[in-house]
Design a protein with these regions (language model features):
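A compositional/biophysical signature of low hydrophobicity enriched in polar/charged and small residues
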Residues: 1-156
Length: 156
């Protein structure tokens, strides 16, 4: 589990503004946060170095780039030895179709959120990759019909 960082009072407005617009200039960010540009720059750097800000990214509409198939895949492992778990995790991390991978409790060991072109591409992902992984015993797929909420911001 990641170590919690104690945020300074000035960090919260910085983080809120950066989550709304990761391309905001340092000058505009400083003005919004009521601090000097140099103090703002130092606080942002400290948040990056402390691992609070992990990266800056653009959010792409997957439908507009041809990735219309969206599913949650529930995976069970038959073997939970460290080697099998590490191999599964390492393998899943290399796959561009896997947007999220969660280790979970309940009836599945892992939940994967998948995006790909279509059902045929998903079938290839299953047959060529997931079913071929040593230790995978069960795979259950739930198709996502509509995404009602997708939020990247977190409350700080």
């Amino acid at each position: 589990m990641a170590e919690k960082i104690d945020l300074q009072p000035a960090d919260r407005p910085l983080l809120e503004a950066l989550q709304q617009d990761g391309r905001i200039s340092n000058q505009d960010l400083a003005e919004r946060s009521a601090m000097s540009a140099s103090a703002c720059w130092r606080r942002v750097r400290a948040l990056e170095e402390g691992g609070v800000i992990t990266r800056y990214t653009a959010i792409i509409d997957p439908e507009k780039v041809g990735l219309s198939f969206h599913a949650m895949v529930h995976v069970g492992l038959s073997r939970h030895q460290a080697h099998h778990v590490e191999t599964f995790i390492r393998s899943v991390m290399t796959r561009p179709e896997v947007l999220d991978c969660f280790a979970t409790t309940g009836d599945a060991d892992y939940h994967l959120r998948i995006r790909c072109r279509d059902l045929s591409a998903y079938n290839a992902f299953l047959e060529d990759f997931l079913f071929a992984l040593e230790g995978v015993s069960t795979v259950r797929t739930n198709l996502i019909l509509r995404q009602l909420k997708h939020e990247t911001r977190v409350e700080v």
